[in-house]
């Protein structure tokens, strides 16, 4: 079970598994025939407001720590989507979370935060299972 992260314009590799675009916006002017992802879940991208803030569209760019806090907070409304992805990975599907070609630093990209949220969800599920087993 693996969760990888990439930009959407990085070459496809045989072990990418399910390639999931997690951007709020679809890449502009990209023909459908040139799409490099299997599914697009825009709800897992930053909100329009958060996207504008991190890129400084309405003033100075938002500091990373503030972006991280707000993105994680926003994703609490996407718990079901995160649980679905955690289940896919837990059952052996490799998942590649894909973001904008402009997002060159994975350490400062929401796709890495999302990977952490999925991994945390998997850990909680494993903990719940262990607790149930120890009760018997």
Each model region followed by its residue ranges:
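Residues lining hydrophobic/aromatic ligand-binding pockets adjacent to catalytic sites
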Residues: 1-136
């Amino acid at each position: 079970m693996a969760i990888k992260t990439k930009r959407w314009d990085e070459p496809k590799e045989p072990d990418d598994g399910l390639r999931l675009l997690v951007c709020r916006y679809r890449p502009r002017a990209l023909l459908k025939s040139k799409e490099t992802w299997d599914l697009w879940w825009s709800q897992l991208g930053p909100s329009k407001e958060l996207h504008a803030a991190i890129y400084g569209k309405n003033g100075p760019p938002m500091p990373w720590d503030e972006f991280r806090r707000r993105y994680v907070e926003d994703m609490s409304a996407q718990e079901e989507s995160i649980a679905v992805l955690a289940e896919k990975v837990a059952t052996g599907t490799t998942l590649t979370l894909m973001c904008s070609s402009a997002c060159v630093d994975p350490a400062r990209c929401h796709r890495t935060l999302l990977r952490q949220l999925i991994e945390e969800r998997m850990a909680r599920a494993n903990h719940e299972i262990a607790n149930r087993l120890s009760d018997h």
